Amino acid sequence: MSSTHSTGPSIGIDFGTTNSSIALARSGAVELVSFPTAGGTTESFRSVLYLEQRKHAGRTQIKGFTGPQAIENYLEAEHKGRLIQSLKSYLTSRTLSGTEVFGRRYSVEDLISRILTDLRLNAERQFERPIRHATVGRPVRFVGAESDEDDAFAVERLRRAFLHAGFESVVFEMEPIAAAYAYESTLDHDELILIGDFGGGTSDFSLLHVGPGVRARGRTAKDLLGNSGLGLAGDSFDARIVRKLVSPALGSESFERSYAQAKDRPASIIPAAPAWIYANLERWHYLSFLKTRNVAEILKSAHARAQEPEKIEALINLIEEGLGYQLHQAVQRLKIELSHQETAEFRFRDGSMDIVAAVNRKEFEGWIADELRSIERCVDRLLADSNVLARDVDRVFLTGGTSFVPAVRRIFEIHFGASRVRTGNEFTSVARGLALRAQEMDARA
């Protein structure tokens, strides 16, 4: 039978919270899509959408950009539009069906489909054929999911977004299992492996048998011993950095002025600005929604009452000037530097803001201690539910940007031994595995 669909082969798409990538497997060889950037090309496409208003022929139009072009146009714009990050994190929310941008209503699926459309068009240009079928990664547990029903709801929203983007069929595969296929392609023997896939929004784990023998006899349900996941990863680590270093400089620990000067009356303990604003500041996918008239009025009032009005002014400037991306980059730089060295300096300077702080790795690991414990418990639960002892696992393969964090890797080195822990192609292994899985399914079609 034909090994491809009538409208071309299936491709593998890793639509991630922070980054996305696409790959096509042909005769066992995997080719990743390269995306143009101002400085050359990249195989990692930022999962961001930038919308702005432009005048054309006397009419105002809403122009959209995605990926590297979104960042470039956002940075060049004198008057910032809306930069929307981490859209994948909205998928479980039943209360957030969409948002209004420049007076036009967009559903979450509409926004995601804009990114997916550009991913598809880039793939079509490189492979010189129509792309209508995809094997798509999904986390074991979506951000915000509290039940299997929440995950199913998120999958259906994501499926609709793919259909809106011009795809005709979509097959979903667990992201850690996809990473396992990529790892399997390097083996000349069978192994029982634990895969840890750490993205921006989720940490996912799978325990399964892989190898040439497994492929030769044909995969069965018994080869997969278990999956486990939780809705925290790199973005959760970022939130801790924002809470510790950024929010206090923007007034999170500031209070209203006390008008009671008498000694027998306590000073004001009422926060100058509501806590939910700072909670949204910590989450990249909510940051763009702070730029509203309601928030502006709240902060104007807070500025008038604050003991430290200059901090509230800095917060207002951050929101009004749309500096979320610059803040995100500063946080990312600190996290990356602390993954490679013991100390680093956090720097975020823009206008009325001048935040500089020295941070050491031990201090950072203290900030993310709760998240690290959650990851460790998730792995322990997977082993227990699968009736597998740590010593029986042949290899641990870690992928995703957060796998670079030494404290994350240490969890697995302690449990399984450093010699059994491997990493590789941290940003593209899921897409590679999805492409191999797509080729495998096409061959059986």
Where are these regions (language model features)?
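N-terminal phosphate-binding loop and flanking beta/alpha elements of the actin-like ATPase fold
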Residues: 2-41, 68-195, 209-236, 355-389, ...
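A short, compositionally biased
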Residues: 16-18, 43-46, 341-342
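Phosphate-binding loop and its immediate beta->loop->alpha context
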Residues: 28-159, 163, 240, 246-323, ...
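Rossmann-like NAD(P)H-binding beta-loop-alpha module
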Residues: 198
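Helical "lid/coupling" subdomains associated with nucleotide-phosphate turnover
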Residues: 215, 239-255, 279-445
